[in-house]
Amino acid sequence: MNQSIIAASWGPHGRGAEISYTIADSPFGRMLVAVTPLGICALSVHQSDEWQESELRRDFREARITRDDDAARPAANAVLRYLRGETAGCEVPLDVSGTAFQLSVWRELCAIPEGATRSYGEIAARIGRPSAARAVGHANGSNPVSILIPCHRAIGANGDLTGYRWGLEIKKKLLAFEQSRADRATLNSPIQPG
């Protein structure tokens, strides 16, 4: 995935944002996709629709939020096609808010190839802040569009899976899904002369 991350078109807590959302079944649970006119601003996976709606309203408490399946469906369908293995990637614009540091972490997460992982320390070093592994972890936890900005690819220094907002079981499933896709891509690639 090579995401186009747009710095938020709205103010703190969604001030000035017009957000539409939909909820659909995904291979990883119920999925909420929220969009502005510029892109996806929130994506969550959970078993409870009510909990996801409550989180969206809490995170964007100053936005005008409407459940509008028609407006959000194209973005949700793009994500679902990717999660079902029907497309090679999910390149949809993102309209997200974060500090300059968070945005640099999120861009680096998007650069990690499917099927690969990086430690928080490796991510910190790649963005030029080698002593900021803990801050990278906090930026990971602040990611509003989990899966699309693949924070599940970040792991502990010892290789252990670490916390994930939607639970370690979903993190394991996402990593297995991506590894399977990466393995298939390798099997289907032409043999290079050597």
Predicted regions and their residues:
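Basic nucleic-acid-binding alpha-helical/helix-turn surface characteristic of O6-alkylguanine DNA
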Residues: 1-131, 177-194
